Amino acid sequence: SPATMGFAGVR
């Protein structure tokens, strides 16, 4: 999810 880090969350 995007809430993880922003870039790694998208993956």
From Swiss-Prot:
Keyword Kinase: no
GO cellular component: extracellular region
Subcellular locations according to the entry: Secreted
Domain of life: Eukaryota
The keyword Secreted appears for this protein: yes
Main localization, broad class: secreted
UniProt keyword terms in alphabetical order: Amidation, Neuropeptide, Secreted
Single Gene Ontology BP annotation: neuropeptide signaling pathway
Residues annotated with Arginine amide modification: R11
Function recorded in the entry: Myoactive peptide. Increases the amplitude and frequency of spontaneous contractions and tonus of hindgut muscle.
The protein's name in its UniProt record: Tachykinin-related peptide 7
